[in-house]
Amino acid sequence: MRQMIEATELTKNYGNVTAVNGISFSVMEGELFGLLGPNGSGKTTMIRMLTGQVRPTAGSARVMGLDPAEDPIGVRQLIGIVPEQETPPSFLTAEEYLHFVARIRNLDRIDERCDRWFDLLGFQEKRDALCKDLSRGTRQKLMVAQAFLHEPRLVLIDEPLINLDPIVQRTVKDFLQEYVRDGGTVLISTHILEIAEEICDRVGVLHDGKLLYCGQTEGLAGPGRSLERSFLDLVRGDAGA
């Protein structure tokens, strides 16, 4: 299997604060990998380094063979990105926004691509609504659609299900799992243990900028112990170290 993401001793300091501290991990093709940790653990900073939005203080990364610190535009042309709680332009309709993204990426068959995603994510009836009038869940569907519009092989999603109702959560989770089954690769960040347990093949547990565990999701739980108990023990043990 091809290595889609490789992080090597990635570190990011903001003044005297270390947001990410020497983290190394890899994500393989056809994998749904989760960065799992509480708020403030370094998940978003890690994604921003991998997508070239933030330069690391130390260490390096390769994303689909490119260095995001040296070629951020090249990386972002290849991958899909769903930032946390990103809001599309309020003055555009949902359809206009997808057309705008498609034109920026010089895509063909724009109408066909947009129709597919409105149907696939189940918000065809909202295509003519202004983005400012969309519910939070529909806006999230729209941001997922724009990330997949150019049919990328790798997508990075920061907190994909935050503040979404259960029906929208189910739609997004089902779609991500189907995308991976079809050969795509996804890296998500989440602070919700149940999401990682349900849909992720492997997880990296982050706390205070450090990687405490990286491996199979079921391997996080010890014999006779729940995943939640093991996760909390990891985080509390690190906090007390």
Predicted regions and their residues:
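Conserved ABC ATPase "signature" region
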Residues: 99, 103-126
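Catalytic Walker B motif of ABC-type/P-loop ATPase nucleotide-binding domains
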Residues: 155-159
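ABC ATPase "signature
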Residues: 214-215
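Helix-to-loop junction immediately C-terminal to a conserved catalytic motif
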Residues: 51
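Conserved catalytic motifs of ABC-family nucleotide-binding domains
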Residues: 151
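Conserved ABC ATPase signature
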Residues: 130-137
